[in-house]
Amino acid sequence: IRDRGKSISYRLVYTGRKDDTSLDASLFSDLDMKAPDVYLGVESSNPTSLTAGIMVAFEQELTENPAHVVLVVDDLTATMSCAIVAKKQGIKVAHLVAGTRSFDMKMPKEVNRMITDGLSDYLFTAGMVANRNLNQTGTESENVYYVGNILIDTIRYNRNRLLKPIWFSVLGLQEGNYLLLTLNRRVLLNNKENLPVSYTHL
């Protein structure tokens, strides 16, 4: 859209707090994005309380700022909560990164994915496997759009804009001589036996 010289009027909603410690102060400018128009300020370590809090706050947001479409991203509790609220208000839902599956219903994110995809009017996928997953659950093909991997797209778009973080020089890191990874899966972090095995394989 940007490359075609067009724009869409939208509001960016962040369900957490403005002073969220997981948000770097320069995150949005680094990614060439506008800062959120509103921070709902919802936080809770309890998934049920978090879901309820986001739903109440987002309902108020949509009441004050009606929308034609609500675009939700990924597979978070916020993704599912906002999709439910939008659908209950008769607003179309678009899901970016739809069709992702682990086929493990013990994972909270898998529940989020299933519910969000089931409610969505437009499903934007990262790959053909995701398309197949949606088709196998009865999603109409005309509602599924393969748009590619937005993470890779974001890296490609920003890679020449961003400076190396200062910790590159502080730690003496050299290109090709380090490995950066994230470990955020409960199955890894909650099992003392799994974590050492992961490090060994790395």
Name what the model sees in each region.
Residues 107-111, 193-198:
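Charged helix-capping and loop-helix junction motifs
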Residues 17-22, 41, 119-194:
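A nucleotide-sugar donor-handling region in carbohydrate enzymes
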Residues 9-11, 94, 122, 145:
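A structural signal for isolated positions on well-ordered beta-strands in alpha/beta enzyme cores
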Residues 9-50:
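Conserved nucleotide-sugar phosphate-binding/catalytic loop shared by glycosyltransferases and other
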Residues 13-15, 96, 182:
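Short hydrophobic segments within beta-strands
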Residues 1, 27, 39-140:
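Active-site and donor-binding regions of nucleotide-sugar-utilizing enzymes
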Residues 200-202:
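Conserved small/polar residues in nucleotide/adenosyl-binding loops
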Residues 1-8:
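A short, Lys/Arg-enriched amphipathic alpha-helix followed by its capping loop at the start of a domain
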